[in-house]
């Protein structure tokens, strides 16, 4: 395997025990080794202020929640849906449910009531943990839920009678009633642990079921992406817990390694992140490229404002060369990117042991025997050739199956591999270059063009705030490479000038033939651009140069 030469001194041997439990591993290990008073999590809430919890209290409260669930009479592997903002009750309930052998179902606070109802119905959730506002928005639609029988309300609680058979309880007081509790359920490492939802091909979200071993499957990231130190790192994450990226890098992984996590609830403000780094002496900062870009544009902070910070990480979308270079110039720190997916979390990343090549995704982390295959014949592609990223089915980080979608699971998991649908190529030095999903790759006049290569070039233009390259069909069988651009505020550049910029900086077959100016892009709840929904109707200007 090409990438192995850069990790030749870092062989990885998996040690997956027969029995393992994520809830127990994330809450109990450090509380039993003499560091039980260490802070596990700090929440900075704009309205409620600062709150924190030690590993000892996280262990106790998550065990109390586990006992509370058992008392509801639900059976092993029943689903517990968690719909909460970033707060201390989130890890208590998310991890506590897994401690008891149930399946946690994290959901976004951005979802509408109808969307929550869909997830609750699809997952068959019997228990819901949420806040009073969300609960009252759900009440008119409860007739659609045949499985839900218990609701725990976090935070403010209004005691009143509801016209349904569902039990509604105040989470805090209910936890305090639990004074004795048993050990965590002795789950198998391969038992289901949590169920995350991602965009589906049918227009409905699809559930991705992970086993308890998934936590162990991400251990290489602790060394080769997080770059954890032997001391007590303090990780500030800018995301929300519902997202797979944040559930791993901002919750489970740091807690499993005994670190302190800092999260925020409230408005996203550039200077606010600098203030939090300084206040809590954060050593690791994790975000998406948009956050890094905002800090550079909207704050005057420099290295002296974040003296404790030593490591920065990014995922979710591609980081532009411009942001990478400006961040290094301003703060003296590199930003280490990773590529992942709901089915496999982050498994390809840049690392501190190798120079970063802007535009490259880095390397598969040790232990993950990633191969680039031709999906037609399952043969590895040659150096520099385009192949689908495929994961061996026995990789401990890989998901179990799609929830209630047997055909979908079989479509992507067969012949000993999980076929990600993402394409990439290796260069001669083992660096992996991500090309995108098969559906994203633009087939134009016999060429196959990665939208990411085009976008990387245009994001370096000082007038471009964001952009998306797609294929535009003309006639029956012709496709043009076109680019949609959102300009920086006050920019006067024209679409024609942007076409010329592409011709100067890209091979002729990659350069966009048309540039559209747009004010916004259709995006997912987590901020990813929905390329399939981009069309000329969203544009406010168009190039006419030939």
State what each model feature region is.
Residues 37-87, 91-95, 112-117, 172-173:
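Conserved AMP-binding/adenylate-forming core of the ANL superfamily
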Residues 37-39, 175-197, 204, 228-234:
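Conserved pre-ATP/AMP-binding loop-to-beta segment of ANL
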Residues 51-56, 186, 193-217:
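Conserved AMP-binding A3 loop
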Residues 111, 128-130, 285, 393, ...:
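AMP-binding/adenylate-forming catalytic core of the ANL superfamily
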Residues 170, 256-259, 282-287, 296-357, ...:
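Gly/Ser/Thr-rich phosphate-binding loop
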Residues 216-237, 244-283, 294, 298:
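Conserved AMP-binding/adenylation subdomain of ANL enzymes
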Residues 367, 379-411, 449:
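Conserved ATP/PPi-binding loop(s) of AMP-dependent carboxylate-activating enzymes
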Residues 504-529:
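AMP-binding/adenylate-forming catalytic domain of the ANL superfamily
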